[in-house]
Amino acid sequence: MRLVISGGGTGGHIYPALALIEALKAEGKLDDVLYVGTKRGLESRIVPATGLKFATLDLQGFKRSLSLSNFTTVRKFLGSLGEAKKLLQDFQPDIVVGTGGYVSGAILFAATRLHIPTVIHESNSVAGVTNKFLSHFVDRVAIVFPEVAKAFPANKVVVTGNPRAQQVAGLKPNDRLRDFGLDPHIRTLLAFGGSRGAPRINDAVVAALPIWAKADFQVLFATGRTHYDQIKAKLPDLPATIKVVPYIDDMPSILPDIGLLISRAGATTLAEITALGIPAVLIPSPNVTHHHQFLNAQSLTKQGAAITITEDELDNHFPRRVVTLMEDDEKRAAMAKASKKLGVPDASDQLIAVMTTLLSKRR
């Protein structure tokens, strides 16, 4: 299979694409792949580092409000279609897949005009603007959250899960916590707000640390690189059971030894924790389109797999709520079971099946 794939802007669009590529390689189904992104997006740093072929288009996203820059957005989109078609004609893909973000718009639309089989993947509970637009032209729409199906043409939708889930589903408890001076046999709370950190989560955790320091569990707190020095400087002396770090490389590898996670509710994080059955306290970012992180979190909370706490609810009761949950093994076990039930450990295989079925119909 010759594949062109595009997704960018955030890790939530990039990592599912990379997970799909990895699965195709593992199954011996990938002859060649070209990743299409932008020069400015996060994908421009992440994808080339993997050794994949990487091409760029000059695009930008829409502003949600009335803005003159939206005229530039349209102009760049229309202007990039010719370049996108040339990329496709030169590479000659069998199929083109988009995993979200404005960058995927031009290459997917161009593929539909060239009658190349196309699939888009929507990882959130609210459809992205680009995916909503593309859904009217592509062949299939793969989704994670069933509730987002209503945003797309019903005859194109298939529930596959997030490919990132399959990438982590086989992980087992290990000694990774020892790298941080913690005991993998002791109940562990992991708190982080993403690679850049989340100031409101950081503030809430810093305020809670003196209380958690007296509890019978250990804490690993990743502040985000930007905030680490400032936070470390103002922390009091803490016991050996609490470790504060700027960032955790290969975050999924540590999850099997985590008793409770405090984090944002991005699609990739939720795919990972449900694949592994990790109970979570989810604090959705309010700074995302259509509050999709809140809706992502609610999808887990309604099934008993997580607790949703908004930033406005990060009050003086937050530290004790976490202690109560950490001390309630039965409650966390029930949450873990519910989380695992929501996981899709074969998500990549399901998406690949959609792709191969589509290709077989075109032959």
Curated annotation (Swiss-Prot):
Q: Name one GO biological process term.
A: cell division
Q: Which GO terms describe its cellular component?
A: plasma membrane
Q: GO molecular function of the protein, one example? A: undecaprenyldiphospho-muramoylpentapeptide beta-N-acetylglucosaminyltransferase activity
Q: Which domain of life is it from?
A: Bacteria
Enzyme category, top tier: transferase
CDD domains, from UniProt? GT28_MurG
Its placement in the membrane is given as: Peripheral membrane protein
Its UniProt entry gives the catalysed reaction(s) as:
Mur2Ac(oyl-L-Ala-gamma-D-Glu-L-Lys-D-Ala-D-Ala)-di-trans,octa-cis-undecaprenyl diphosphate + UDP-N-acetyl-alpha-D-glucosamine = beta-D-GlcNAc-(1->4)-Mur2Ac(oyl-L-Ala-gamma-D-Glu-L-Lys-D-Ala-D-Ala)-di-trans,octa-cis-undecaprenyl diphosphate + UDP + H(+)
Pathway it acts in?
A: Cell wall biogenesis; peptidoglycan biosynthesis
Q: What is its EC number?
A: 2.4.1.227
Source species: Lacticaseibacillus paracasei (strain ATCC 334 / BCRC 17002 / CCUG 31169 / CIP 107868 / KCTC 3260 / NRRL B-441) (Lactobacillus paracasei)
**Which positions does UniProt annotate for UDP-N-acetyl-alpha-D-glucosamine binding?**
10-12, 124, 195, 248, 293
Alphabetical UniProt keywords: Cell cycle, Cell division, Cell membrane, Cell shape, Cell wall biogenesis/degradation, Glycosyltransferase, Membrane, Peptidoglycan synthesis, Transferase
InterPro entries in the record, alphabetically? GlcNAc_MurG (IPR006009), Glyco_trans_28_C (IPR007235), GlycoTrans_28_N (IPR004276)
Q: In the UniProt record, does the keyword Secreted occur?
A: no
Stated family: Belongs to the glycosyltransferase 28 family. MurG subfamily.
Q: Which cellular compartments is it found in? A: Cell membrane
- Primary location class: membrane
Name of the protein in question = UDP-N-acetylglucosamine--N-acetylmuramyl-(pentapeptide) pyrophosphoryl-undecaprenol N-acetylglucosamine transferase
